Structure formats: structure tokens, C-alpha cells
Curated annotation (Swiss-Prot):
Family, as annotated: Belongs to the RNA polymerase beta chain family.
Record-level Gene Ontology MF annotations: DNA binding; DNA-directed RNA polymerase activity; ribonucleoside binding
Species of origin: Burkholderia thailandensis (strain ATCC 700388 / DSM 13276 / CCUG 48851 / CIP 106301 / E264)
Domain of life: Bacteria
One Pfam match: RNA_pol_Rpb2_7
UniProt name for this protein: DNA-directed RNA polymerase subunit beta
Enzyme class: transferase
Function: DNA-dependent RNA polymerase catalyzes the transcription of DNA into RNA using the four ribonucleoside triphosphates as substrates.
GO biological process per UniProt: DNA-templated transcription
HAMAP family: RNApol_bact_RpoB
Length: 1368
């Protein structure tokens, strides 16, 4: 078994019973793959597939001019490399993007050429087509300096859908069937039955029309329409009555209206008897071909074809006419013998199309098309060309209508065709096939579709959404180019004169900047990032709206299994509309979600893994992942629990075709991080998975002692840790960078064999939490590719660590944990367990105003030196300064308009030369309620503006850092080269060299060490080949130095050129403040099982309940929070955490008494290999075992995977191992060792009963009381009512509302009430008066008229009612 560098240091003991057959796929794959297919940047132009940008270009080009003599063709496109890297874009507020250039060809044809067109001229040119934002390696985009995520959209797949209204439309409760053809782009086509069973169609939800109008419009005659939808009965007219062709199936179940006889005249069915199977057999036995029917049997039947008089050519009766006595007489007159009628019955062959034809008043194709034109364009005159153009554009034009590959596949599958490809527009037979299926549904054959089935909903990913926007931009460009192409020849234009890239840029910018699906990335912790990128939303353009979405769409559907998580979804109005991809889910080429299954052949489970979509899955019998399997892979049980088409049943093993890959297959990343999820109620699990995303990264992350084994995958895939790109040896490491000398076999020839990782230090995330990376390797460590080198935010030794492991006791404590409150020990705060660092970014810009430029300076009048004390000579705060609310961070003055001066002032000015009052102080100050330490300052200066000292110093520091990286690389490169050189030179014969090396001397190591390395190149060797080698090495070193110098120059140029700033901005300064937040009452905390609460009190450690060995509890929770919420998982987690810590203490005690390594090995083997998944401890050296044991002192980490976790029996085994009888007795534990006798910290008395105690991974959430509370005495007031504003952002007051007024009224506190409603609210004069009185020390209140009363009076007057106040 292979362990990575970090896994060896701390192995997580897994209780999984099942072996891993399929690794969890890369969690960000959907985003990254989708965008790379959109760009196809690393594919040669000739080999690009028709998708993404390539598809957009080929769909719009070639563009042909109106006269047809000029056309613009698309050749290929290329993307340039971005000007700034990701970090620079974030600092400067730029978009991380790449310029798109398309090579286009302008072809001009000769107008004079008499026959076929001749090419006169071809011009080819690269044209700039706008900027395309690039995806970062972690699946996000940097737009205007902030990281954003494009969320995937779950929408209705294009294709054809059949449904009914569930009897809701008509009062009778009759089911009205309908069908809808949805294209990817273009007009929707609906077909629907009305309560009278007439079939209508409508285009784009406009007015409905009989469907036969559409059939006529596509060129069918009434006869053809009837022939398509009905079978015919053939009659031969006799002198009396008629003969009807005998078709057995059509008679079964009918009631005979007359005696039915065979050829001899023997009665087989008597009149008024129902015809049954025996009668039919008798008729068939009698070889009946025709049945004689009386005349009235024909009446009321409908003719299937036009009946024409053979002699005169006159139409006697039209198709779809009813046969009456008059019609029969006419037919006999014209001596017509054979007629065909429509066969209909009430059961399974309704006359729907026939009745629709009767309603339809149009005569022929033209009339039908005109009717459609009038419905689409009411009020416009229908000219022949316009009618034709509109009809063709509706469904037959490739520009306006696109079914897409998916739509065509879904359509063909639904109408029962074998091939899944075909034209992308609608065809006549598509419309016919749809109507046929709809009529069959009405006839009672077939099933309607389930729109919530994941086979009918598909996912649109980033790539596809961006492509649609890009195409929309290109189509706008196409219109403009068409206009100008006519002048291309006469004005001798080049392609770049024709194409204006603005529409494309604006479409792309609008999509990435303000689309509903482009969201500000949730970056609170690594899990929230990864979940945000795996989110699937049903909202957004072309999707549902919150208000209109019903219960069915939001509900969990059987097809969600393994594709979409049934647990993780927001609470509130979006519930069920926003989902998360399941752990193993994957998109197929059509955008449908697939999930992996293991193939089962003859009741034997194989290792073959197939990805099945929701539709394919419905055809198979699938066993669950926990089905018992023997060693050879056979299914053991007689009956196996399995699913088929969404139904669960027990079947015999021979019927099983597939089996789940893993028990955690059905849940998302967040839900799979909850241990004992199977013991939690679903509602609480939902809260648990949502709250893990809000956990604030702690200062010292701590791995959860009870995890699920997926923590490592999440940490690595989120990109928050640093992974080794290539294996090698750690050459240098400090807090900010790691240098690795790459293994020879992994280094590419001619490339630097050095990897340098600059770590992210104290950087602000989107949510103002702190992102900081810490190295976990030492110099000299050997690392392999993919090993974790540094931990990021919320990771510990390469595992996700969202909170801290707390010693928890479940017991009430003086009412301080009433209603989910949390009681916490002061020790937790003192040890900084939940202390987090938050980084605030404060900006100030100096603009060019009408009155002159604003200036960033230290020279500000009317400010005491104390206030300027933290600023440097440029007026910018020092790094490391500790600042509080109101302190100046950046000094800035703004010119103020010239005021009219009195002659006296003018004189004073002239004497003292005072200019100070021309400017006002607009410095950047620390906002109220904030204090912290300045950790970074960035200064950006516009091109052509003089840089101040501070800006120059920042650039110099950055260059120094970069030079350090280059020197490290050079040092290692040269070191390697000189080592190779020494091996080559030793033992060679020299012709001469430095330090008077004699000719013919053999070079030895001592001689080389005595020389400076660079002088080695001066040695003249006798062997020509060796001399050539020496020269080659010298050249390669010089080449490398030259390359590094160039790179340094490039960097310097980039840093010293002016910055791109918004118009009118001369200088911008960003100051970053680090704010330390300790845990305090009012902060929200939660476990992973939806058990949330608010800290109510922080209790001195000496008052907390403690155990017999003096160890106090960290957190006291209310036991009443468990039974009604049904999240029992937290109790099991506490028990297992107790065992984990107990084992850790035992290992610590063994290390303390310096046990033999062998004894350690035995104990560790007992822990790891007695149950659950076995670990290969044999392969560990003694040193590695020792390091492992040292890392386990704080607790042996356990993994209890979702739905495959630790059993009760395994947990008691671990508790027995952790707490042998002597320890258990000392702590006065119960027999099952999960409850302990606790003592009251205040009295020292033992509590009456033993208490459940153990360790739980507890999180501090991003709802911090510091961000929510604020205080105000005076501040801004509303303009109209003069009442204080509300809310923290406005620095507002607390609303004293209607009910609070009632409370004071009820209490009779009249003065308090008067004060509340006047001087403390909106009595303007009263407010100032109170302030004045307070200053004078005279505590009197004069309440006046509240301003809002005046507003009321004015409003009443505006209604025309005169209202006046009598003042006495």
C-alpha cells in the first residue's frame, strides 16, 4: 500500500468495510474540462472540434454581402498569453483574461464575370475580437480583481415532451394531453387537446389554432392527413345494404347491431350481443372475408377520401364528410361501388384529427400559411414573400432554429427512431411523429414524460454558457459586417475595417460581470469554494424563477441517486432549486449527469466501471454498495436489495446487472464530510452540510479526530494546499517559500531542475477571512509528485480542518445552555483555539477634480502630530502599525472652491502667505468599530505621474523577492552543473590550466577544490571530446544566466510601468488591516450535525465541570438539543472522539516512559488492524513508526465513512482499548466507558449522575457578533422624517417600534415614552437643545414637535384637507 508523504505522518484509521474500487474523481473536473473545451487553446487550429469558440465562429461565418459579391470567411483563432498573472490582476483590480484574435479572409468576386463567379481578390488578416476571461487552475475567474464562479445551470433538455394537466384545467377532471417541442434556440411548438378533444397547436405560447392548419401548411391534403392518422374500413355498396371487409380485431368488444352470419347464412352472432373471442374464432373458421351490413350501419360514418364521379370528374363527397342518406343516394346515382371510411371507436381509436379538420376553415397550403402569419404578425399585410419567409424561418432556418445535438438525440429517442443524429432543424416527419404519439396517448397507449427526471434535465456548464454569450456577440457583429461588406471593394477595405469587436467584448463582459449565474465566490473556507464550484442551479436566464417553481421541481427525485445530492440545498425560498453535484457524478457529452456503477456478470461483481445516465440506469437492476460480497466477488445473500427504474425491491443475485461503487455515492462533498450521517435526521444533515461552509478558518487548524476519510481529497482538490508538481528533495524552506531540487528522471532536459513555491501569506479572501499557507516539509525531505508541501487555510497536514476538537459534556449548567446556548470554558479563549484573523481592505483614490488634483500627503493642516504619527513622509501608514477606529491611514487633501474673502482676511493671507484653507481633509480613516494591524500597503500610480518614495520602496521590495527566487534557481542549476563537471574532469589529462597546471598532469579532486569554480573552464584538456563537453557546459550556464537576467528585466519593466487606473484617478492606495477576532458571547458555533447555537457565557476554567483526574470540560451542551432534533450522529461522534483521544493519551504515555518500538508497533497494529480497513504498518521503518506515534499523541484520527461507518461493537472495542479498567475505575466510568463522573467546579461536589463526555469537532461560524453589533449616539438622519437611519451599514439606530411603544404605554413610563418619540428620534430643535443642556450640565428636556408629525400634516394637506394646529 502506497502512503504519501503526509499520510505517513498521521494515518487515519478507517472503519470502512468495503475496499475502494473507484477513486473519487477530481472535484473541480466539471468546471475545468468544460472551459478547456470552450477555449481549445492547446489544440492546433486544424484539429479543433466544432465546439466552444470554434463552433460559434463556424456557425456565424462565412458572412456574405447582400449583393453576394463579397464574403468574409473564418480561418482560425488564437489566444495570446495574459499580460498579468492572477495575483497581479487581483491586486490591480483587473480581469485575468487573454486577447482573442481571429484570422479572417475577405474574398471579393468579380462582378463582370459572365458565367460562374470568379474570385477577384483575397485579403487575409488577424483581427482582434475582444478579451476572453481565463479560468484559474482552481476553476474560478478573476473579474475586476475579484474571484467569481460561474455556476452550472440545470435546465430542461431540448427535445420533445409529452404531458397532461393532471385534470386541473377542466372542471370535469378530464386529462388534457399536450406535447411540446423545445429547441436549443428558436420557437417553441406546442400541441394540446382541448376538453372537446380537438387538437390545437401554438407557436411560442401565442394564440392556439387547429393542428390541421399546421399539417396543411407543411403541404398535406386532408386525404393525406386522414391517411396518416387512421386505418380505414372498406365497404362495397350493394343494391340493399353493403358488404364490409372483415377485420377480426376491430369487432372484438363491439355490440352487434344486427345478426352477423357466415357465408352460408348461419347466424354466428345474434343482434345486441357483445362480440367475444369465441365469435371471432368461429368467423375466422368459416373463412369469412366480408360481412353483410344493413344500410343504417353506414350512416354517421366518415369518408376517408374524396369521392369523384368517374364520368364527369365532379366531387360527390369530400374526405372527412359524414355519410348521410343524401350522400348514399348520390353515390348510388354515380354507380360508385367501393368506399372507404375512417375506423374509430370510443376505446382506443378516437376521431380527434377528424374533428379537428372540421373545426379548421382553411382550404389549402397557402391559406394555412397565411393564417399562421396572421397569428404571428397580427396587423401586417400578408404578402406572398413575407408569408413564405416567416414560415420557413420558424422551424426550417438554421439561423433561427437549432435543435442541437442533444435535442435531436432526445427527439429521435422519444419518437422511437434508431439513429440519434439528424438535421438540427425541424422536419415535416418530426411534426407528424409528434402528433401521432400525442394522439396515441389520448387513445390510452403509452406514458407521459416526467419532466423532473434527470434524463429530461441537462446541465449547462461554464463553457456552454460562455459560448452562447460569445455567439450572441458575434451575431451582432455579423449584422454590422453585412452592411459594410457592400462597400468593401469600392473603398478598398481590409477585414479589420469591417469587424468591430465591441459587441463581443460587451456580451462577454456582461455575462462574467453581471449574469445571475456569475457569482461572487464564497471563499470562507476551502469547502465553501469547492462546493460553490460544484453547485447546480435551476435559476438564471432560461431557467426557473423562485416564485413560479412548484413543489415537484424542488423535490428529491429517484434519478438524483448518485448524481445530485439529496441533502445539500439551501433553506428558504431556493430550497431544491439549487443543488450540489454528488461525489462521483460526471457530465456526459450531451450534458446529462452520469454516475459510476460496477458491472455484475452472473452474480459476480467485476472491476469494470460503467458510467450510466439517468435514462440508461432505468433499464438495469442495480444492487446497493453495501450488498454482501464473498472474497471472489460473488453476491452472497439469497435476496439482494436493489433498484430498478426508481423502485426498490429484493431480488435474487442472478438478476443483478450493476452495483453501486461506494456507499458515499449519493451525497455531495459537504454531506460526505459528516461522520455518522446515517444516524442524523435529513433536515439536520442539511443544516450541517450548509454550516460547514460557513466555518471560519482558525488560527491553528486542527484535524477532526472523527472524520470520514474524504478530508484529504477535499483539501488537495480545493487548491488551498501546495502540492509538489514534480518529485525531488527539499533544498530550502522558510515561512514564505519552498525550493525543491527536482529528481533527475523527472527534470526535462535543458530546463531548470528547480521548482520554487512562493506561499500565500496573510491574504484576504472574498469573505475577508485569512488565507495563509504554512510549510510542512523540512530541508532534506524527499517528496514525490502530488505530495502536500504546505498547508493552507483550514487544513492540517493536508487534511481539511474546519474547526477544533472540543471536550464536550452533555448536561444543563445553570440555565446558561437553555435553548441551544453554548457554555464555553475560558481556557478555550485563552489558548486561542477559535481565534481567527480577518483581513479588511481599505481603499483611497486621488482623483483629478475640476478645482485641481487631490494629493496624497502627510502635510494636513488642523491635524495634531499624534494623529499623523503613524504616517511616513509620503502620507501612508507604516506596515505593522496598530490602528483603531478613526485613525488616519492615508493622508489626502482635496482642493476646495475659492470662497469670497473679506479684505481683512486677504490682508492676513498676503502677510502670512497662508494657503491651508484652500484644501479640505479627505483622508482615509479606519471605519467605526474596526481596529487591527496594518499588514500590507499597495500603491498604484497612473502612467506619467511622479511616484512617491513609498511606491518606489514597494517596487524595490518586490524586485528583491524576485531576484531571490532567480538566485536560488541559478545556485541549484550551477551546483548541478559543477557537480557533473567535477565528475567529468577528475582523472582526465590536462594540456595546461590555471595555477601553473603542467601539461600531461592528471586532474584530481584536490586541485579542483583549490580552484574557484569559474576557473575550471580555463583548464585545457588533452581529450578533444571532453574539451567540447567542457565548452558545452560553460555555454549552457551562460545561457541560463542570460535567461534569468532577461526575466528580471521583464519583471522590472512590468513593475515600473504605470498602472491602469479608472478614468480620472491619479493614484490609488490599498491598505490591508488584519483584525484578530477572539471567541466571545454572541458568536455562532455549530457541530457538523446541524447542532448550532450561540455562545452565551465564557466561564472561568475553575468553574467548569471536571473529571476525577482534574481535566475540565471545554464546552457544555444541553442534552435536550438531541432527542427532538434526531441528530444522534453527534452523540456517536462524541463517543468515538472520546476513544480517539483516549488512544492518543495511551500512546503519549508510552512515549513518555520510552517504551520499546516493538511494543509501540504491537499497540498500533491493534488499533489499526483489528477491524475496518487494514493498514500496512509493516512497511514503516522504526523512525517512521516513532514519528507516527508522536503525531498520534493528540488523538488517533478515525474515519467513519458515510453509510459505511463504525458499528457500535467497533466503538466499544476502541473504548475498551483506550480506557483499560484501571483508567476507567480512576475516572469512575460506566461499564460501556462512554459516561464519566463529573464534579461541579464551583463546589467540588460530584454530579448526581454520570455525564456523556467526549470529543466533538466544533466549528465557529462566520456570523460573528463583532460584525453585527454597533453603537450610535448621533449620526445620519433621514431627509424627510428626520429620524435616524437603520442598519449597521448606515450607522443607524435601533428602531423603537409600535410594539415597544405599547410596552412603555402599558408600563405608564410617560417621560421615557416622550423622550423616545421626540428628542431621541425626530424632534430636530429638541435634539440640539438636549445636547446644549448636557454640555452646560443642565439636565432638562424640552420636547418639541416631531418632524414626522409635520410630514403627516403635509400629507393630509396634499389630499386637499386643510389642517391647522391651535397653539396655546
Amino acid at each position: 500500500m502506497q502512503y504519501s508523504f503526509t499520510e505517513k505522518k498521521r494515518i487515519r484509521k478507517s472503519f470502512a468495510k468495503r475496499s475502494i474500487v473507484h477513486q473519487v474523481p477530481f472535484l473541480l473536473a466539471t468546471q475545468l474540462e468544460s472551459f478547456s473545451t470552450f477555449l481549445q487553446a492547446d489544440v492546433l487550429p486544424a484539429q479543433r472540434k466544432s465546439e466552444g469558440l470554434q463552433a460559434a465562429f463556424t456557425s456565424v461565418f462565412p458572412i456574405v454581402s447582400h449583393n453576394g459579391f463579397a464574403r468574409l470567411e473564418f480561418v482560425s483563432y488564437a489566444l495570446s498569453s495574459p499580460a498579468f498573472n492572477i495575483k497581479e490582476c487581483q491586486q490591480r483590480g483587473l480581469t485575468y483574461c487573454s486577447a482573442l484574435r481571429a484570422k479572417v479572409r475577405l474574398v471579393l468576386l468579380d462582378k463582370e464575370s459572365p458565367s460562374k463567379p470568379v474570385v477577384k481578390e483575397v485579403k487575409e488578416q488577424e483581427v482582434y475580437m475582444g478579451e476572453i476571461p481565463l479560468m484559474t487552475p482552481t476553476g474560478s475567474f478573476v473579474i475586476n480583481g475579484t474571484e467569481r464562479v460561474i455556476v452550472s445551470q440545470l435546465h430542461r433538455s431540448p427535445g420533445v415532451f409529452f404531458e397532461h394537466d393532471k385534470g386541473k384545467t377542466h372542471s370535469s377532471g378530464k386529462l388534457l394531453f399536450s406535447a411540446r417541442i423545445i429547441p436549443y434556440r428558436g420557437s417553441w411548438l406546442d400541441f394540446e387537446f382541448d376538453p372537446k378533444d380537438v387538437l390545437y397547436f401554438r407557436v411560442d405560447r401565442r394564440r392556439k389554432m387547429p393542428v390541421t392548419i399546421l399539417l396543411k401548411a407543411i403541404g398535406l391534403t386532408p386525404e393525406q392527413i386522414l391517411a396518416n392518422f387512421f386505418v380505414f374500413d372498406n365497404f362495397t355498396l350493394m343494391d340493399e345494404g353493403a358488404q364490409m371487409e372483415f377485420v377480426p380485431e376491430r369487432l372484438r368488444g363491439e355490440v352487434a347491431r344486427f345478426d352477423i352470419t357466415d357465408r352460408e347464412g348461419k347466424v354466428i352472432v345474434q343482434k345486441d350481443k357483445r362480440i367475444n373471442a369465441k365469435h371471432i374464432r368461429d368467423l375466422e373458421a368459416a373463412k369469412t372475408k366480408y360481412i353483410s351490413v344493413p344500410e343504417d350501419y353506414l350512416l354517421g360514418r366518415v369518408l376517408a377520401k374524396n369521392v369523384v364521379d368517374g364520368d364527369t370528374g365532379e366531387v360527390i363527397a369530400n374526405a372527412n364528410d359524414e355519410i348521410t342518406e343524401g350522400v348514399l343516394d348520390k353515390l348510388r346515382e354515380a354507380k360508385i361501388k367501393e368506399i372507404q371510411t375512417l375506423y374509430t371507436n370510443d376505446l382506443d381509436q378516437g376521431p380527434y384529427i377528424s374533428s379537428t379538420l372540421r373545426v379548421d376553415e382553411t382550404v389549402d397550403k397557402t391559406a394555412a400559411r397565411i393564417a399562421i402569419y396572421r397569428m404571428m404578425r397580427p396587423g401586417e399585410p400578408p404578402t406572398e414573400e413575407a408569408v413564405e419567409a416567416l414560415f420557413n424561418r420558424l422551424f426550417y432556418s438554421e439561423d433561427a432554429y437549432d435543435l442541437s445535438k442533444v435535442g435531436r438525440m432526445k427527439f429521435n429517442r422519444r419518437v422511437g427512431r434508431d439513429e440519434i443524429t439528424g438535421p438540427m432543424t425541424l422536419q415535416d416527419d418530426d411534426i407528424l411523429a409528434t402528433i401521432k404519439i400525442l394522439v396515441e396517448l389520448r387513445n390510452g397507449k403509452g406514458e407521459v414524460d416526467d419532466i423532473d427526471h434527470l434524463g429530461n434535465r441537462r446541465v449547462r456548464c461554464v463553457g456552454e454558457l460562455a459560448e452562447n454569450q460569445f455567439r450572441a456577440g458575434l451575431v451582432r457583429v455579423e449584422r454590422a459586417v453585412k452592411e459594410r461588406l457592400g462597400q468593401a471593394e469600392s473603398e478598398n477595405l481590409m477585414p479589420h475595417d469591417l469587424i468591430n469587436s465591441k459587441p463581443i467584448s460587451s456580451a462577454i463582459r456582461e455575462f462574467f460581470g453581471s449574469s445571475q449565474l456569475s457569482q461572487f465566490m464564497d471563499q470562507t473556507n476551502p469547502l465553501s469554494e469547492i462546493t460553490h464550484k460544484r453547485r447546480v442551479s435551476a435559476l438564471g436566464p432560461g431557467g426557473l424563477t423562485r416564485e413560479r417553481a412548484g413543489f415537484e421541481v424542488r423535490d428529491v427525485h429517484p434519478t438524483h441517486y448518485g448524481r445530485v445530492c439529496p441533502i445539500e440545498t439551501p433553506e428558504g425560498p431556493n430550497i431544491g432549486l439549487i443543488n450540489s453535484l454528488a461525489l462521483y457524478a460526471h457530465l456526459n457529452e450531451y450534458g446529462f449527469l452520469e454516475t459510476p456503477y460496477r458491472k455484475v456478470v452472473d452474480s459476480k461483481v467485476t472491476d469494470q466501471i460503467d458510467y450510466l445516465s439517468a435514462i440508461e440506469e432505468g433499464r438495469y437492476m442495480i444492487a446497493q454498495a453495501n450488498a454482501a460480497i464473498s472474497n471472489d466477488g460473488s453476491l452472497v445473500d439469497e435476496l439482494v436489495s436493489s433498484r430498478e427504474a426508481g423502485e426498490t425491491m429484493m431480488v435474487t443475485p442472478d438478476r443483478i446487472q450493476y452495483m453501486d461503487v461506494a456507499p458515499s455515492q449519493i451525497v455531495s462533498v459537504a454531506a460526505s464530510l459528516i461522520p455518522f450521517l446515517e444516524h442524523d435526521d435529513a433536515n439536520r444533515a442539511l443544516m450541517g452540510s450548509n454550516m460547514q461552509r460557513q466555518a471560519v478558518p482558525c488560527l491553528r487548524p486542527e484535524k477532526p479526530v472523527v472524520g470520514t476519510g474524504i478530508e484529504r481529497t477535499v483539501a488537495v482538490d480545493s487548491g488551498t494546499t501546495v502540492q509538489a508538481l514534480r518529485g525531488g528533495v527539499v533544498d530550502y524552506v522558510d515561512a514564505g517559500r519552498i525550493v525543491i531540487r527536482v529528481n533527475d528522471d523527472e527534470a526535462v532536459a535543458g530546463e531548470v531542475g528547480v521548482d520554487i513555491y512562493n506561499l500565500i501569506k496573510y491574504t484576504r479572501s472574498n469573505q475577508n477571512t485569512n488565507i495563509n499557507q504554512r510549510p510542512i516539509v523540512k530541508m532534506g525531505d524527499k517528496v514525490a509528485r502530488g505530495d502536500v508541501l504546505a498547508d493552507g487555510a483550514s487544513t492540517d497536514l493536508g487534511e481539511l480542518a474546519l474547526g477544533q476538537n472540543m471536550l464536550i459534556a452533555f448536561m444543563p449548567w445553570n440555565g446558561y445552555n437553555f435553548e441551544d446556548s453554548i457554555l464555553i470554558s475560558e481556557r478555550v479563549v485563552a489558548d486561542d483555539r477559535y481565534t481567527s484573523i480577518h483581513i479588511e481592505e481599505l481603499n483611497v483614490v486621488a482623483r483629478d477634480t475640476k478645482l485641481g488634483p487631490e494629493e496624497i500627503t502627510r502635510d494636513i493642516s488642523n491635524l495634531a502630530e499624534v494623529q499623523l504619527g503613524r504616517l511616513d513622509e509620503s502620507g501612508i501608514v507604516y506596515i505593522g502599525a496598530e490602528v483603531e477606529a478613526g485613525d488616519v491611514l492615508v493622508g489626502k487633501v482635496t482642493p476646495k472652491g475659492e470662497t469670497q474673502l473679506t479684505p481683512e482676511e486677504k490682508l492676513l493671507r498676503a502677510i502670512f502667505g497662508e494657503k491651508a484653507s484652500d484644501v479640505k481633509d479627505t483622508s482615509l480613516r479606519v471605519p467605526s468599530g474596526m481596529s487591527g494591524t496594518v499588514i500590507d500597503v499597495q500603491v498604484f500610480t497612473r502612467e506619467g505621474i511622479q511616484r512617491d518614495k513609498r511606491a518606489q520602496q514597494i517596487i524595490d521590495d518586490e524586485l528583491k523577492r524576485y531576484r531571490l527566487d532567480l538566485n536560488d534557481q541559478l545556485r541549484i542549476v550551477e551546483g548541478d552543473a559543477f557537480q557533473r563537471l567535477a565528475r567529468m574532469l577528475v582523472g582526465k589529462v590536462a594540456n595546461g590550466g590555471p595555477k601553473k597546471l603542467a601539461k600531461g598532469t592528471k586532474i584530481d579532486q584536490a586541485y579542483l577544490e583549490d580552484l574557484d569554480h569559474y576557473h575550471w573552464f580555463d583548464i585545457r584538456l588533452a581529450d578533444d571530446e571532453a574539451a567540447a563537453q567542457l565548452e558545452a557546459i560553460k555555454n549552457s550556464i551562460e545561457e541560463k544566466r542570460h535567461q534569468f537576467d532577461l526575466a528580471f528585466e521583464e519583471k522590472r519593466k512590468k513593475l515600473t510601468q504605470g498602472d491602469e487606473l479608472p478614468p480620472g484617478v491619479l493614484k490609488m492606495v490599498k491598505v490591508y488591516l488584519a483584525v484578530k477576532r477572539r471567541l466571545q458571547p454572541g458568536d455562532k458555533m455549530a457541530g457538523r450535525h446541524g447542532n448550532k447555537g450561540v455562545v452565551s457565557k465564557i466561564v472561568p476554567v475553575e468553574d467548569m465541570p471536571y473529571m476525577a483526574d482534574g481535566r475540565p470540560a471545554d464546552v457544555v451542551l444541553n442534552p435536550l438539543g438531541v432527542p427532538s432534533r434526531m441528530n444522534v450522529g453527534q452523540v456517536l461522534e462524541v463517543h468515538l472522539g472520546w476513544a480517539a483521544k483516549g488512544l492518543g493519551w495511551r500512546i503519549g504515555e508510552m512515549l513518555a516512559r520510552q517504551t520499546k518500538i516493538e511494543e509501540l508497533r504491537v499497540f498500533l497494529t491493534k488499533i489499526y488492524n483489528e477491524s475496518g480497513r487494514a493498514e500496512d504498518l509493516e512497511s514503516f521503518s522504526d523512525d517512521e513508526i516513532l514519528e507516527l506515534a508522536k503525531n498520534l499523541r493528540e488523538g488517533v484520527p478515525f474515519a467513519t465513512p458515510v453509510f459505511d461507518g463504525a458499528t457500535e461493537e467497533e466503538m466499544s472495542k476502541m473504548l475498551d482499548l483506550a480506557f483499560p479498567d484501571d483508567i476507567a475505575e480512576q475516572l469512575d466510568m460506566n461499564p460501556s466507558k462512554n459516561q464519566v463522573r463529573l464534579y461541579d467546579g464551583r463546589t467540588g461536589e460530584p454530579f448526581e449522575r454520570r455525564v456523556t463526555v467526549g470529543y466533538m469537532h466544533y466549528l465557529k461560524l462566520h456570523h460573528l457578533v463583532d460584525d453585527k453589533m454597533h453603537a450610535r449616539s448621533t449620526g445620519p438622519y433621514s431627509l424627510v422624517t428626520q429620524q435616524p437611519l437603520g442598519g449597521k451599514a448606515q450607522f443607524g439606530g435601533q428602531r423603537f417600534g409600535e410594539m415597544e411603544v405599547w410596552a412603555l404605554e402599558a408600563y405608564g413610563a410617560s417621560y421615557v415614552l416622550q423622550e423616545m418619540l421626540t428628542v431621541k428620534s425626530d424632534d430636530v430643535t429638541g435634539r440640539t437643545k438636549v445636547y446644549e443642556n448636557l454640555v452646560k450640565g443642565d439636565h432638562v428636556i424640552d420636547a418639541g414637535m416631531p418632524e414626522s408629525f409635520n410630514v403627516l400634516v403635509k400629507e393630509i394637506r396634499s389630499l386637499g384637507i386643510d389642517i391647522d394646529l391651535d397653539r396655546n
